[in-house]
């Protein structure tokens, strides 16, 4: 063990610190060492100015903010509240000093003008070349040309086999099939304009009658013939003979009745 630890040293009592002076000494603690809480200050109207101040900011000691050189608070504020943040600058771009809105800048005005022009161009993008009407969608323009445009309605598609005219090209193509008859029966050579008409005709060769009447035992090769037959079972018979007041379910039955010689009831 070193000898210095074994030597007893005597301390001078005159150099003993005065603990009473330390107790009476005022310790100033910076307000920036406390937690950060916004403290609202209600200024008196006769002391403070009308400039609005933001809430006072108090920093915690964990963040270690740099202490300002001047710790003295602003005039009119209590020193225990700490340093007051500077007042926010007023926004002069949107409002003037009187509180009314200022005119829009040239750049914003040009931007609004450009946006309005683009919306106008987009809204009137599709224009009819015949009557100068504008539409926002192409489908609306196409429907206008086909149905509502007077200039387009006068334009027609003529059939090269007869004198019939049609507004649309699709309707003309469907009509031309009645002249060309592209659906031909392989059994008898009879031609039809529609495939379903040919299918119903082929059943006359095969004897197939898939459509049966639910009220009687009759069956038909075509659905349209079944619908006509069902009218005979209906209670409503809207075709009436003018001579004998007899009613029929179909016009063809009324014609047969008139051709056979109507017996007028006396």
UniProtKB/Swiss-Prot annotation:
PROSITE patterns assigned to the protein according to its UniProt record, in alphabetical order: ZINC_FINGER_C2H2_1, ZINC_FINGER_C2H2_2
GO molecular function, one term: zinc ion binding
Pfam family name, one: zf-C2H2
Zinc finger map (C2H2-type): 126-148, 157-179, 183-205, 211-233, 239-262
Annotated SMART domains: ZnF_C2H2 (SM00355)
SUPFAM superfamilies membership: beta-beta-alpha zinc fingers
Region called Disordered, residue ranges: 75-115
Tissue specificity as recorded in UniProt: First expressed on the lateral side of stage 12 embryos. At stage 14, strongly expressed in the lateral neural folds. At stage 16, expressed in pre-migratory neural crest cells. At stage 18, expression is dispersed over the neural plate in a pattern surrounding the rhombomeres. At stage 22, expressed in neural crest derivatives, including the branchial arches and the tissues surrounding the eyes and forebrain. After stage 17, expression is weak in the lateral plate mesoderm, increasing at stage 26, but was down-regulated in the pronephros region at stage 26.
Keyword Chaperone: no
Record's note on what induces expression: By a combination of noggin and fgf2/bfgf in ectoderm. By wnt signaling.
GO biological process terms, semicolon-separated: neural crest cell fate specification; neural crest cell migration; neural crest formation; regulation of DNA-templated transcription
Localization: Nucleus
Family as reported in the entry's similarity comment: Belongs to the snail C2H2-type zinc-finger protein family.
Descriptive protein name: Zinc finger protein SNAI2
CC annotations in GO: nucleus
UniProtKB keywords: Developmental protein, DNA-binding, Metal-binding, Nucleus, Repeat, Repressor, Transcription, Transcription regulation, Zinc, Zinc-finger
Region (SNAG domain): 1-20
Gene: snai2
Keyword Nucleus annotated: yes
